[in-house]
Amino acid sequence: QERMEMITKTTAHLPNIRVDSWSGLLVDYCKSNDIQSIVKGLRAVTDFDYELQMAQVNLQASGVETMFMATAPAHSFLSSSLVKELAHYGGDVSSMVPKIVNEALKARVAESGN
């Protein structure tokens, strides 16, 4: 729920964005919402290996196409695990995440006493 709220606030200025949650398969969500394609960002070749397999399964199982976008080089190393670890040890992640996420990470670190 916290992630949903942060994403909603971060994208509030974008009129064509809808933030939603789904507990099943992404292709089932797509079918339920008349979505014909998925756009995924790729950070590295390792992402591509997995995502290509998933795209092929999704296409075969449901007809939903997947398109890939390369991540900007400045962000290609980022992962939620890395950002959380940096924040946990007091690192500055303000240039890596939206302001609201940075504030939430700082609050979580303060609560944990680190």
Task: Cite the ranges covered by each PLM segment.
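Nucleotidyltransferase catalytic core that binds NTPs
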Residues: 1-114
